[in-house]
């Protein structure tokens, strides 16, 4: 074990403050607690606070004796106490939490049981509220007392999950098995139905449909298990009651079925001779043969199921092993790129050179430790609901002696602000299918208002409408809540913009109607609330000297690693298996790759419900070859004689005419080789293709071949040089079977050559498509719509047509009719930068990083993304987060050498006489200097002359003032107990 000993007073003080657990209860990554009860602690808290739990006075005293400040006076002899009463003795006074089935009032647990959401490291849990109101020391005590009390209760009561808890009753077992068998039969039906559709269905759609169907089976069976498991079952207590360990998925895999195994986000592929395993027939697509495990862990897997399950598990283990190194390297690159960023005394974020990277940290200037999630209900309410909930009625206006004009203006302003935030939320993330109503604010308004909420309280009716509005404006403009140090007109506007969400929160939680009639507040109480909000905001503003760059690097680096490590816990869950695709994409974005692997364009229509137009645009962009339309292809050698044979009859019966010649030779008798190609009518109609298109594209294809003949490889050149002429004929689009004849005259031939020619015509002739676009997909995505007049959310979600193209070709997209040119979305950051500029590129960076992390289940505050993207774009060019990007940041030689290629940087610095000003974090650490951040961002100056001329005075009224001397470290004294060791360095 290693020991770390502070070598100076400053070092010991920083260790004492920074490394102290009570100061690390909330994490900056997502502003949520990172310390809380886990596993047995959560289970014990749940069991102790159940409604039917009671303990006698002796047990109560035993449990309370484990707490730091036991309140024994509350316990009377020979009396029973509920678990809620016992636990309430350790909740600090003044803590309030009111949720649907849970209520704590002034430190008393009145309703509900504790679980993971209330006692663990979760947002707006009791731990979060205690920390927010009472601080770190009281929170540390509360967590310690909780752990001691609930674990000792578990010792008294006993709790274990055993083999007997794995069994379910016969009726539930039959219900689960019936669901599985029914779904497997449905799966056979779906396969038959799709196979009958033949070429009209996309193979990927076919696979995705089958996979989604089987994934839903797992969720349904797990729900049956959850609904029918007895409440006393220890699995139920641990997983569904306390939510301490495991999920419905884990319990379901033990008792019902393991479910569909996923490899690389897809069903198990038929890799060996058209089979997944040797146990199954050729080209078998049924659920059981493609990775569905119908058995559960209790009854054990069949042989082939075990193989499938191993495939899913192996993928997770390999990903974990291979990607851990790359994710660790990502975090190191982030740390080295961001380590110099700090908040300065004018509120800006600057690097070691003093260059401004951000005018306001994270776009809101708030310390990430101090933010809290608040629900803003107005986001989802209609105009009428807002008027009803936040505007006063005529009787209330009369009762409170308030002006109707003032009330109308307040409601109107609230509706306008809500509308603006709705639009900005959807546009910023290009997500129109969901609306979020919970936001991080610098003040926990819900907690503060809960402390003062008491509808039964009697109070003087002295709180006026206009006074509430004045105080809301005062909170927003008071110097305690300033975000910018120097104020000017444009900064006033910026400050107002940065506080928009906070303004909406204040207008909702401090609305005059709620304050006067719901909270029943008087003027004195309201003033206390205003002061609480001001002081909470002041604490929340980020402090000068804060090293926000390193905080951002760790907040983004840790989720990147976690995205990858979580995989092994979900072997068999499709959604988690595909999440690992996020790590390569994150590397791609941070490295500013010029050629990304999967360039994508999202196209939206002007008329969002025009499905016909969406289909047309998709068909235009989709790459379509002759091979995609073929129902049959044959090769004939026909000499064009008049003999009455079967071949002549067959070719004449096709009724082909209207010849398109390949070159100037137009004698059809010279072209004996016939490629007879039958096309599928339904596919042609679906893809909007006619025979004229096919013939034209074949002739143009041959023309391009002839033009490129000189630059061709020898083998391909010999193939096409053999053609001396040809003609393309077709019947009519109205014919029963659309047919094409390609007749060729060859100088010499062999059969492999004939086959190659036919394959080339089938696979290389593109009938539709756009250069640079390898494919496209037409889908309908949910779009939430709000009524312009009423502001209400539509009861049924609307769907808009979205075309996703695999590739980018802006010139072609610009001329597409019906496409909304203002809503095109490209995922290639470099392309956006070159075309639209640095601000557009910054926006894409934020959106792409957010989407990638969200897909992997990683959660962190938006502010961290803003810091990273601002660093990548503050120079006006895109700075990559790697060794190439550091050169654009104008770092000094020592700082550059601390990252990579150390000797190269030192040699260059020596050859070109470069100077290091020792301002960067790495440079100062190398030279033993204090870094220019935190307590090193300022210096203390002492007037020694005043000190020399001063004298000590006794205060005859207060007594002599005692000064504490320097404290020696007890640990050092024990180690160096012989007294001969030089300990001067301690002081």
Model-inferred region functions:
Residues 34-35, 119, 138-139, 172-179, ...:
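Secondary-structure capping and boundary motifs in well-ordered enzyme cores
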Residues 146, 150, 255, 307-311, ...:
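Short alpha-helical scaffolding segments that buttress acidic/His motifs in well-ordered protein cores
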Residues 143, 149, 153-236, 240-247, ...:
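Extended, well-ordered alpha-helical scaffold/bundle regions in very large, multi-domain proteins
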Residues 14:
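Active-site-flanking segments in enzyme catalytic domains
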Residues 6, 20-23, 47-51, 147, ...:
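Hydrophobic/aromatic-lined pockets within catalytic cores
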Residues 17-37, 286-322:
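Polyanion-binding loop/helix "lid" in catalytic or ligand-binding cores
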